[in-house]
Amino acid sequence: MFSHTGSDSVYFNRFGRYGKGGAYNDKNSPYFSWYKFNEWPNNYQSWWGFDTLPEVIEETPSFNEYINGKDGIVRKWMKCGNSGWRLDVADELPDVFIENLRKAVKDENPNAFLVGEVWEDASNKESYGARRKFLLGEQFDSVMNYVFRDAILNFCKGQHGKYTMDLIMSVIENYPRPVLRVLMNSLSTHDTERAITVMAGEPLDSKDRE
């Protein structure tokens, strides 16, 4: 996840675990410009308000270089044999960062796979006040198909088949064919309830769902 780091990391170093450096302790730290301080050091922007997860400014040149540069994190792991990347919370990453990351990945291995976590229809997703470019050829090869998950599970719970088909057809009609062929379809992930839990409904009389 490239939208934030841990507060207890060498980059932020809130608790001094890594000596006197880090953005929290030193304004001259090479990592200081990565973070969004409202009032240094204790008031900083963090992911969903969790102060253990300070947000980074992905457009910062030194951060981009650290992740996507010639000797950056992405290329390092590609050289180690990584065959692809799944980008968490893709809608929180700026277009330019995703495009730079894609270039780093494809430079190392043109056949490597890049998939984004997008919960809605990725063809018309809006964030950062603009329509996103996830599927226009310069960012992701595919995305997670949560639209499919919702359609199938709701159908199994009694949703009318027409509504289910409308959801599935919207993806088929909106997504480029190369993306459709490699969509990441799933009924459960680490971010959702398991399908069996959704299907079973709520526990009754203090009994479990079995």
What is each residue range found by the language model?
Residues 49-66, 82-92, 150-162, 195-208:
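The substrate-binding groove and active-site-proximal loops of carbohydrate-active enzymes
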Residues 1-79, 107, 124:
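Substrate-binding/active-site clefts of carbohydrate-active enzymes
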Residues 9, 60-63, 71, 145, ...:
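Short, structured coil/loop segments at alpha-helix boundaries
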Residues 2-19, 73-75, 82-183:
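Active-site-proximal helices and loops of the catalytic beta/alpha 8
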Residues 44-49, 74-77, 144-149, 186, ...:
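A broad, low-specificity signal for short, low-complexity segments enriched in glycine/proline
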Residues 159, 169-210:
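Active-site-proximal substrate-binding groove within the catalytic cores of carbohydrate-active enzymes
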Residues 32-38, 64-73, 85-86, 101, ...:
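Aromatic-residue detector
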